[in-house]
C-alpha cells in the first residue's frame, strides 16, 4: 500500500535510521528491544568486533592474521570512496591481489563480509560475464559497519550536513543486505571500463537483468541508470530513495 507508506513516511524513515545504527546482530537487537539504549548498542557492537578479531588469531594461520586485520579494517574506508571498487593499494601501499586474496577468502568463508563482483556485460546469464578482478566488499551487518567508523548515534538518527558521502555507503550496505536475504538472489554491479556510469547493483531476473540504483536521500537524478536503460533496454529498473513511491518512464 504505497499511500500508507507515504502517510507514515516520517516514522518509517526514523525506524530505518534506527536500524542503520542498531543493525541486525541478534545480541544487539535483543538488548536494544529491551533497553532502548544506543550506548549499550555501541558497546555490544564493539565487543563483537573485538571478538571477531580475536578469532582471527585463534583460527587463522599466524602469517595471515595481520592481513585479515588490514582487510577487515579497510572496508569502511573503501566504501567511503565515490568509486567503491576494492583497491588493494589502499589497504597497504604497493599491495596487489596476491597479497590479500587469501585474507579476503577467509573472511568470506567465515561469513563476515560480502563480495559483490563487477559484471563486464549486463546480459544473461550474469555469471558468464563476471570480472574477477573488480569487486566491492561489504560487512555482514550495517550496525557493525557504523560501529567501526565510531559515528555517533545522533549523526545517524538525526542526520548531519557533513555526513554526506558515507551515507551513500550505508545505503548500499543496507540494500545489499535486503537483496541477499532473498534466497537465490546474487547481487552484482556494473560499470564501464573507465568506471563512469556505474550501476550500484544488478540482479538476474527470470527473463532479464534488473538494474538497481541506490539513492541515500530524495535526490532522484540518475544519469547512470538512465543511460543504462537507454542502451540496454531492461524490462524495468529500480531506484531506491527516501522519495515517495512512483512509477515512471525515461
Pin down the residues of each PLM region.
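Phosphate-coordinating catalytic segments in nucleotide- and nucleic-acid-processing enzymes
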Residues: 81-82, 97-98, 114-117
